[in-house]
Amino acid sequence: MRLRVDLLPHGNYPDVVLVVDVLRATTTAVTYLERGADALLLTATPEVALGLRGAAGEGGVLLGGERGGLPIPGFDFGNSPVEAAAQNFTGRVVVMNTTNGTGAAHIAAQTGKHVLLAALTNAHAAARRARALASEEIAIVCAGTDARVGLEDVYAAGVLAEYLLALGEFRIDDGARIALTIRRNAGDPLEALSSSGHGQHLVGLGLGDDVRYAAQVSTSTVVPVLDATQTTPEVLRFVGG
């Protein structure tokens, strides 16, 4: 079994893919499902998200997303896991579009057999689910920030890799070795996330609570899983697994 870590999304994923955007899209996605959402729809663009609202009518779906860390005009929510954790989404469908994470999920879905969303908050559950599904390879895909490698995602990939290596034997690539090295040398999760460039950006926007929330490890058993039967090139449907 191969274990691969892509420090940025590259594509060509033949088996299981764990998409990581710890600050903040995949952390927020896990929280939406924890708080009762029936499904998450990750769109290719904000315009597609707004179109889904128009098609569904008032109250049909809720929109969450950001650009540059700030809420998208016309959306109901930003991309804040703290904000999401304070809501009740029971029975609702949440449509998401973000700067980095939703795009990484779309790249993964082009070829991946099983696509999961992973964060620190669900790291143990995501690793177990990935191992159970995999037949030849698990790829951990870091979303990065504006096409640049993000310390926070590589750190989270290292946490996931540690869990996976505890579950069985893998042939690891250089990306996995880099992620494991970062995990072992970047301090505790909050220190790693807070010292990252994107973490500092969010703190500067007054979103330090989101960074602290995202630094929690294995507090959730929810793993968003792509429902390939109800997915299109512009809209990916994830449900809790």
From Swiss-Prot:
Give me the segments passing through the membrane: none
Keyword list (alphabetical) reads: Hydrolase, Magnesium
Cofactor (UniProt): Mg(2+)
Question: Which InterPro entries did the record assign?
Answer: ComB-like, ComB-like_sf
Question: What are the boundaries of the signal sequence?
Answer: none
As its record notes, the protein acts as a catalyst of:
(2R)-O-phospho-3-sulfolactate + H2O = (2R)-3-sulfolactate + phosphate
GO molecular function of the protein, one example? magnesium ion binding
What PANTHER family does UniProt report for this protein, alphabetically? 2-PHOSPHOSULFOLACTATE PHOSPHATASE-RELATED
Q: Which family does it belong to?
A: Belongs to the ComB family.
Q: Report the protein name in the record.
A: Probable 2-phosphosulfolactate phosphatase
Instruction: Please give the organism.
Output: Deinococcus geothermalis (strain DSM 11300 / CIP 105573 / AG-3a)
Q: Which gene encodes it?
A: comB
